[in-house]
Amino acid sequence: MAPNLRKSHPLLKLINNSLIDLPTPSNISAWWNFGSLLGICLLTQILTGLLLATHYTADTTLAFSSVAHTCRNVQYGWLIRNLHANGASFFFICIYLHIGRGFYYGSYLNKETWNTGIILLLTLMATAFVGYVLPWGQMSFWGATVITNLFSAIPYIGQTLVEWAWGGFSVDNPTLTRFFALHFLLPFMIAGLALIHLTFLHESGSNNPLGILSNCDKIPFHPYFSLKDILGFIIMFLPLTTLALFSPNLLGDPENFTPANPLVTPPHIKPEWYFLFAYAILRSIPNKLGGVLALAASVLVLFLVPLLHKSKQRAMTFRPLSQFLFWTLVANLLILTWVGSQPVEHPFIIIGQLASLTYFTILLLLFPIIGALENKMLNY
């Protein structure tokens, strides 16, 4: 009998074991779709980004007009640009839901997969930040100035570090050029990290909504989940194209329609919506270094999640107290996102400080306590 090429060829064998014959738990829900959605987001962003890069000029005098030129004069340039800008938003929606899924169902107990995932999140955040600077509008320029300036809070080396990153004494042409280079490079780094992420995942296999071992009941990835993933792609592309075609500037900042001007500061400097929760945490501490540390901690705290798992059950499926805490955390993040978009004045300052305190308290204190309490209640 002739050998099956799909199972014997060195390259096809890899693809086969990852996407075709992969044994998958039969009961994984739609929450397990977000991994493949992130993959398709990355592909879409790389493709649209490549097409945009062919028409973009990384120079302070030309960047803004080159983006305008792409939208006006390039065939479907407006569509490519709108898909790329809003694709970033969908990328973040998917990654936040993906992290939330991992948190709810205890997937973080696959430590290597979880840790590479956090590194992926940090790389994605860096990519989105440098990308936001490229159109060289007002919010691009001032966002770059404010965020890079935070590094100057690092004792002793801070100022040198910032000037080294800027390539001068302020955000200027060298900054834009290197940000473009970084924005081109990082997505390929993300693709590489995603492969590492998958390699670690396939070591242990997928978790499932019950949080129990599923070796006794697994089904092949293809056709069951390949088809389910395609349905997921369609469901995601529908709102993405709707947004890009009907309301492309809904999530953007109107300030970015004004070319960058170092002499005029916008009244409210704020990042894109997907960074607002972290921005609110940064602003809630009235000290530069303290704010920077809190900002870093807001994402890096995820590394501690596997160490703070005290429950004897993996998923939250059968843990109502932890579920209540989880949804409180979600609501808390939404409040932080809203506060981050508001000006720094009376009610918002205290709301932001309370929400920031609650965020860290829930993650570092309440989750382990409630986990241990649930063990007690179930006589474990």
UniProtKB/Swiss-Prot annotation:
Keywords: Electron transport, Extinct organism protein, Heme, Iron, Membrane, Metal-binding, Mitochondrion, Mitochondrion inner membrane, Respiratory chain, Transmembrane, Transmembrane helix, Transport, Ubiquinone
Gene Ontology biological-process annotations: mitochondrial electron transport, ubiquinol to cytochrome c
Cofactor: heme b
Localization of this protein: Mitochondrion inner membrane
Functional description taken from the UniProt entry: Component of the ubiquinol-cytochrome c reductase complex (complex III or cytochrome b-c1 complex) that is part of the mitochondrial respiratory chain. The b-c1 complex mediates electron transfer from ubiquinol to cytochrome c. Contributes to the generation of a proton gradient across the mitochondrial membrane that is then used for ATP synthesis.
The UniProt record lists the keyword Chaperone: no
CDD domains: cytochrome_b_C, Cytochrome_b_N
Bilayer disposition of the protein: Multi-pass membrane protein
Remaining remarks: Heme 1 (or BL or b562) is low-potential and absorbs at about 562 nm, and heme 2 (or BH or b566) is high-potential and absorbs at about 566 nm.
Record's subunit section: The cytochrome bc1 complex contains 11 subunits: 3 respiratory subunits (MT-CYB, CYC1 and UQCRFS1), 2 core proteins (UQCRC1 and UQCRC2) and 6 low-molecular weight proteins (UQCRH/QCR6, UQCRB/QCR7, UQCRQ/QCR8, UQCR10/QCR9, UQCR11/QCR10 and a cleavage product of UQCRFS1). This cytochrome bc1 complex then forms a dimer.
Protein family membership: Belongs to the cytochrome b family.
GO MF, one example: metal ion binding
Major subcellular location class: mitochondrion
Residue spans crossing the bilayer: 34-54, 78-99, 114-134, 179-199, 227-247, 289-309, 321-341, 348-368
Entry GO terms, CC: mitochondrial inner membrane; respiratory chain complex III
Protein name: Cytochrome b
Binding site for a ubiquinone: H202
Keyword Iron annotated: yes
InterPro entries on file: Cyt_b/b6_C, Cyt_b/b6_C_sf, Cyt_b/b6_N, Cytb/b6-like_sf, Cytochrome_b, Cytochrome_b_C_euk/bac, Cytochrome_b_N_euk/bac, Di-haem_cyt_TM
UniProt-annotated binding residues for heme b b566: H98, H197
